[in-house]
Amino acid sequence: MVPGAWHSLLFTTSSASEKEENRSQRMQLGEQLLNSSTPNLPHTFYPLTGDPSSAVHSPSLEFSVGHKGQQHKKYSSGSSRGLQLDSPREAGSSSTMLSETGEGFSVAKTLPDNVRKGSPSAEEELNTAVPTSAPRYLDGSLQAASERYYLQPQGQQLQQTTTELGSPCSIFPYAPPQHSAVYPAGGAARYPPYGSMLPPAGFSPPVCPSRPQYSSGYQYSQAPGTMYSPYPPAGTGSGLSALGLPGGGAGVRAQVFLCNRPLWLKFHRHQTEMIITKQGRRMFPFLSFNITGLNPTAHYNVFVEVVLADPNHWRFQGGKWVTCGKADNNMQGNKVYVHPESPNTGAHWMRQEISFGKLKLTNNKGANNNSTQMIVLQSLHKYQPRLHIVEVSEDGVEDLNDSAKNQTFTFPENQFIAVTAYQNTDITQLKIDHNPFAKGFRDNYDSMYTASESDRLTPSPADSPRSHQIVPGTRYSVQPFFQDQFVNNLPPARYYSGERTVPQANGLLSPQTNEEVANVPPQRWFVTPVQQAAANKLDMGAYETDYSSGSLLTYGIKSLPIQTSHPMAYYPDAAFASMAGWGSRGSTYQRKMTTSLPWSSRSSPSGFSEDLLPKDKVKEEMSSSWVETPPSIKSLDSNDSGVYTGACKRRRLSPSTSSNENSPPIKCEDIGTEDYKDATKGLGYYSFYSSS
């Protein structure tokens, strides 16, 4: 060993003795409390104590007295700065030994077992606390240091210390080596930003030096539009491409929302079907979109393209759709529908929802490129509508090859199967319930119609258990007029109209409950146009009766509650209950009124209804004559497509043969004559209900 090394060893022994002398003084400062936390602290928090128990955690643990010479040689040769321990100047001067931060470790690692081992920071702090050791530290900068925590060294010594302690900076993510502060500010703080908590693929091996690279992790996680991104354009793999910025320039992606998406989802659960006809049929639900993210000043064309959704041919079997072969890809025809308002500015398209309610689907191959822009489809094929937004150049020419100007949006819930008649009854019912025009059931209930073409809107309730829902009660504005106070006494007869009939078993005009519908044979209800009632008022002046115009409202509303009271009771019961029904003036009056008034046999005008029966008798007769009517009589009524309630009255007044030729014979030819008496009317009434 060189002589300089022996001098260094002697000096180290002397330094250790000085530490033992000042141990009691340091314990008064509370250093013993800091000693207790030593085993759990990394190198950045080594306490400044002289307790020998902390020596096991010192970086000089691997050096012993028996090998102090070898270790000193090893450490001297490995030092980057090359300790010249053979110099007499360095043997007597501590300034040279501690002139560099790293040299203090080489001396502390050769201590004997009976001497306390500690980090260089302990000696540095000891010099500050005890003035007697001041000759050992000639560097003023180190003497002025009063921090109780060890400041990270610079250069190669930091890497060696980090390796010996098992990379503790993975627990305490301090700043890179260029920082010298204990709590550096900025992105490399002790508490890193949220991005470093969730790196894309876990923490990388260089945790401490490379920690700042995670400061911007998940930089798009809080960006607007990415948490709940809309459907991206077709052909793009990221939702960010659909994020539009209003007022952006070229290449900015638009953002499209399906306005009636909940309605589409209802149909999509049962596999949506769309009717195609030769003349063209509009879609329901129709396509309606909201568009954002367009350039307000640029011009765009917006159009819908219908393409095959899959290469299969479909059929409805066993209550579900199944594939049966390959689709015909050679189908020629128009597949594009351009919105009528195209081209237009981005501000126009973003102002309100874009509806394609006039888009029509057809199976007519000859309807190519016509003015109606009908889309030609094949039956029993599944199709997918796609929305295209194409930016138009200044000269009005579209550049379909420029992907930055051509954007396509696809919504899977818009898929549908083209059919010529609805296959799934659930889809039919959804169309009826939600389509205000109720056109869906026309193609599905053709086999149920038994009447003429004018009566095609009246399917038989016996054939269709859902026919009572064909016209929802909330669809007509006349519903508020028919409250319980008006219809509770209304017999379940018909409302007549020469135009259209609507089946109602428990719908708008029916006073029956659901239980009664199940027990009473079905019958038809007629909705009378308002215009017809207005014309009826003009005809009332020619008759002998003294009616007021207020008594002739639509559907005979005034007469319904008046039936409950009859102060003039000199008319026999049979006169009111008979099918002629309107007293001695019945023949003349009925011949004039039957062609214009839609009254049923129970909806008498007020002039006669007040003179006929007491209230209790009216209720009794109505319950006996209408609720307990034999099925044959009501089947006669249900088979009639426009005659009046009294079959005998219809036969007497109709110049042609009635449609109820198959009905039971009714002996009522004499009813309604001028000289027919009240008793005869009663016999006619009872014979009418007993003949069945």
Swiss-Prot record:
This entry carries the following GO cellular component terms, namely: chromatin; nucleus
Query: Which regions of the protein are recorded as binding DNA?
Result: 263-443
InterPro entries for the chain = p53-like_TF_DNA-bd_sf (IPR008967), T-box_assoc (IPR032385), T-box_DNA-bd (IPR046360), T-box_sf (IPR036960), TF_T-box (IPR001699), TF_T-box_CS (IPR018186)
Outline the segment boundaries, as ranges, of region: Disordered. 35-135, 595-614, 621-673
For whether the record's keyword set contains Ligase, the answer is: no
What is this protein's function per UniProt? Answer: Functions as a transcriptional activator playing a crucial role during development. Functions in gastrulation, regulating mesoderm differentiation. Activates wnt8, t/bra, chrd and mix-A/mix.1 expression.
Q: Which gene encodes it?
A: eomes
> What triggers its expression?
By activin and derriere.
The record's subcellular locations are:
Nucleus
Positions of the UniProt region annotated as Required for transcription activation: 578-692
User: What are the GO BP annotations of this UniProt entry?
Assistant: CD8-positive, alpha-beta T cell differentiation involved in immune response; endoderm formation; endodermal cell fate specification; mesoderm formation; positive regulation of DNA-templated transcription; regulation of transcription by RNA polymerase II
Keyword annotations: Activator, Developmental protein, Differentiation, DNA-binding, Gastrulation, Nucleus, Repeat, Transcription, Transcription regulation
Q: Where is the composition biased (Low complexity)?
A: 596-609, 654-665
Q: Where is this protein chiefly located?
A: nucleus
Q: What is this protein called?
A: Eomesodermin
Source species: Xenopus laevis (African clawed frog)
The entry lists its GO molecular-function terms as: DNA binding; DNA-binding transcription factor activity, RNA polymerase II-specific; RNA polymerase II cis-regulatory region sequence-specific DNA binding
Question: Transmembrane segments in this chain: where?
Answer: none
